[in-house]
Amino acid sequence: MKVADVPQDLKYYKGAVVRDQNYAVDDEGRYHMVKSDGWEPKNEALALALQDDKDKEERSHMRVQPTTDFQGFELDLRHQPAAHCENGAIATLLSYYGIHLSEPMIFGLASGLFFVHLPFVKMSGMPVTAFRTFPGILFKRITKLLGIKTVTKRFLSKERAMKMLDKVVLEEQKPVGCVVGMYDLPYLPPEYRFRFNGHNICITGKNEVTGDYCVLDSNATQKVTISRDDLIKVRFATGGTYPLLGQMYWIKSVPEQLPDLKPLILKSIHKTCRNMTSQPDFIPWAGANGIRHLSQSIREWEQKKSSRKAKQNLAQVIRMLEEIGTGGAGFRFIYGAFLQEAAEKTGLTILNDYAMRITEIGDMWREFAYKASRIIKKRKGENYTYDELGDLLQIISEKERQFFKDLDHTNESKRSSTGFEIL
């Protein structure tokens, strides 16, 4: 596969999902950089968010830290891009121990796909909409499935947090995942720095003379460095979604032999299906119920809020759908890639049909993003309405509910016929 051959307007390439406007995954699960100017709705949502950002003035004076070759102690790990930061951090930690799993497989095994719309939880003053499970759950789930022992720490003391980081990286010589705030990461372009305190990076080395740390960040294009002061600032970021407490996590030990992936794949598919369809009606914010709840709420935004505020809410949903590391369409394309790989590893070729179905649902999410961006722009001759968006979300909700019910039924019947046990 040649990178230049990947067409930007197609969702598939040789049977695999083109996961993002910046990367593509080939039919062997390998990711490749793809040159692109970006996808328009995503860019328009970002432009609106930046225009109204209270940090606009400060952001205008930000400069990107130049990339330099790291000098100092460094673990033998290569940088690899990923659609989502937690997937990327997990892949890096696992690879250090010789465990090489693709990003879709990590995401699928951890039952990462989800939906939640929380009008009572705010990010940048607007309701939080998420298309995946809550931060930290992916690492916890996949390591438990694989029988890997891990450690997670949080701190009140910044000094203790940095001493523990140095101990694990320098003395134990293990890579460490850190949860950080994005706003003060010096190597990111200013337009991609916002007050989101849930980004995952890996620390893989330290220069004990300068105090700089070597960082593997799947959002960056290569290995980067960060100063001790900047690392403290992002590990204990305030504002944004919630204050951080220097959270760090690492692998303590791995079993001599990993378990067979086949039953784990089926178990994970079952868990994802249950998460999306078994939410009770009195919890209207999660799973397929949550999509329906958003479809109802979105119709009221223009009447109950100002036109400007309604557009900002739309932009927030688009950003969470397309920009926040989802690989496109709220992780639906990545989940399609997982089902393709699952079909190969389990021999259940029918999962390829489900991969196509979830990717087609992903196309509907992209249609939603496109129409929402047209409302934001209000271009001549384009008269999409909030009611139309609500109708589309209602259809998506019904399709996802049916998709996951069908997938769970197929998964259960195949498990029974093959003898795989789902716990």
Regions found by a protein language model. Give the residues of each.
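Conserved active-site-adjacent core of cysteine acyl-enzyme catalytic domains
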Residues: 50, 61-101, 112-246, 250-255
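A short, charged, amphipathic alpha-helix used as a generic interaction element across diverse proteins
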Residues: 6-9, 45-53
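A short beta-strand micro-motif
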Residues: 3-7, 11, 15
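Acidic, low-complexity, intrinsically disordered interaction modules
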Residues: 13-44
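Charged, long alpha-helical assembly modules
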Residues: 316-423
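Noncatalytic regulatory segments and standalone regulatory/sensor domains
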Residues: 208-324
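Short helix-capping/linker segments at secondary-structure and domain boundaries
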Residues: 95-104, 339-346
